[in-house]
């Protein structure tokens, strides 16, 4: 753990040389509701249950010093796992549930607006585009790939505030909606992805490197 933190600090310091302000978060997350609907006559749908995983997010903000609103971009990636999934047809739940192994991984990139309030609080709004891969292995094997629209709403409280370095906690909600994609079933059938959503709630720790310091914020 100490080595991981040392690598993160070194990476943040290096990135700060290129950007005015850099943030990194390490989060755990759960997905209380995920839906994956394939474009077929009976609208086959997969709903993974109890998925839990981890994610990293990097935020790069431009301009100096820090202001009430900072504009930048975010890059996020994550991985989660689940053991159970429900299957639906025409909106009706099928009797058999999957108890095999499933996973979901994603990568998202998009613009971001960060709202700084006082010394300790900041809010993040970040729409973006991403790619998502869902895989399920059971009596039926499914691999689904989608391009998604993503909206991330986050809150961070900074409990350590030093000039050029800040540490705090991170919590938020993230919504992903597929725009296009396909699903392969048992290596025999390929369907277009019709609709769906992934709702994610996350929490973790946050690091900030650069000029988001209380003294510079007040000076602005």
Label each PLM-derived region with a short phrase.
Residues 11-18:
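Hydrophobic h-region of N-terminal signal peptides that target proteins for export
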Residues 29-35, 74-82, 128-134, 170-178, ...:
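Outer-membrane beta-barrel pore domains and translocons
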Residues 28, 81, 86-99, 176-196:
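Primarily recognizes Gram-negative and organellar outer-membrane beta-barrels
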Residues 19-70, 84-87, 181-185, 200-220:
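Short glycine/proline- and aromatic-enriched beta-strand/turn motifs that initiate or cap beta-hairpins
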Residues 1-4:
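Positively charged n-region of N-terminal signal peptides that target proteins for export
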Residues 52-149, 157-163:
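Gram-negative (and chloroplast) outer-membrane scaffold detector with strong preference
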């Amino acid at each position: 753990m100490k080595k991981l933190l040392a690598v993160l600090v070194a990476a943040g310091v290096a990135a700060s040389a290129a950007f005015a302000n850099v943030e990194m978060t390490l989060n755990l997350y759960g997905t209380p509701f995920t839906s994956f609907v394939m474009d077929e006559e009976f609208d086959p749908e997969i709903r993974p249950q109890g998925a839990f995983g981890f994610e990293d997010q990097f935020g790069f903000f431009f301009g100096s010093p820090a202001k009430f609103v900072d504009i930048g971009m975010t890059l996020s990636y994550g991985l989660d796992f689940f053991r159970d999934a429900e299957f639906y047809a025409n909106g009706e739940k099928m009797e058999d549930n999957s108890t095999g192994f499933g996973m979901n991984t994603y990568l998202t990139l998009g613009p971001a607006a960060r709202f700084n309030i006082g010394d300790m609080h900041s809010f993040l709004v970040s729409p973006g585009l991403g790619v998502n891969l869902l895989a399920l292995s059971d009596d039926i094997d499914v691999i689904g790939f989608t391009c998604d629209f993503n909206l991330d709403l986050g809150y961070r409280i900074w409990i350590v505030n030093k000039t050029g370095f800040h540490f705090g906690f991170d919590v938020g909600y993230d919504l992903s909606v597929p725009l296009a994609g396909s699903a392969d079933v048992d290596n025999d059938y390929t369907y277009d992805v019709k609709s769906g959503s992934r709702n994610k709630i996350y929490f973790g720790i946050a690091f900030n490197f650069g000029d988001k310091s209380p003294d510079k914020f007040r000076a602005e």
